[in-house]
């Protein structure tokens, strides 16, 4: 049996624990310090792609999540104010859906219920840790002077970097100079077809995720200098602004929720492995939310790690398996990082003539091959089919 420590109880940390527990390892989860109570009281939604669904099914939590309500969608429609439109359809890759909108609380509850039934899971608080020093040969030091020797340590949250004495992480960063305003919108009428929308306008991006038959979750990315103005507007005025921008697509908005704001920044690490310490999920990368891939990228990290370790069943954790994880995470996440940044810059570039943008978007929208390739990347189908010999199919629960 191996000792695996996971710093951070984010969704990525918890799902990592569940996936890695299957080989009867001793799993130690170190919960983060309590978060801001205001953020805790606001429900978050995620767009889950097909690779993430596969991992939820493999870990045996999909049926639990599904029973608490999900919103599948078949189409994504993007448009800008000059009239250009691009439509992505699940038919392009011969699947029923492109993704699923799921509450964060539903995912977390399903994982925690599964973990609570496992005897090889130990929950601790990160506040119990005094320091972790690589020179001490894979040991976690506790405030009470006790020690825990680990075979593998997963760092799943950037908030926990401070417990390391000598861990230097090299990162490539990108300042988007934007913040995201998150609001739930209630419509006057129901929409029969579940579609995710995205509107590109001057220095702003509005992503709309269907969360019920007459509600959308709006992620509104705007320049940081403008976000306070929007945040402080009264609900009546803000509803009018949103109706002017969005009602032609989703219908009349009659009510909006309270709103939250969070800053946007991008980064990726140059290496995911530091001896027996590995970075995963939010500790390793952050991207603009325009593609809705943040959580999915973290779950893809777990998929790659699980694949790497299961390729080495005899020794399980060794240099070869960790190199596999490191190399594949670097290759895939770096590509996604720069692709997302390119798309953002393309839509915002005022120096690029509108006629050129229009022709490029029209060509792309008519190219079934190009769109299919993009969809396969974004949904994780390409990754699944490249690794699984049988292709993407329903895995056995365990």
Regions found by a protein language model. Give the residues of each.
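Active-site flanking residues adjacent to catalytic metal/cofactor-binding acidic residues
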Residues: 7-8, 30-31, 156, 281-282, ...
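Conserved FAD-binding catalytic core of PHBH/FMO-like flavoproteins
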Residues: 56, 152, 156-251, 257-259
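FAD/FMN-dependent oxidoreductases across multiple families
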Residues: 228-317
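C-terminal helical "tail/cap" subdomain of flavin- and related membrane-associated enzymes
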Residues: 307-398
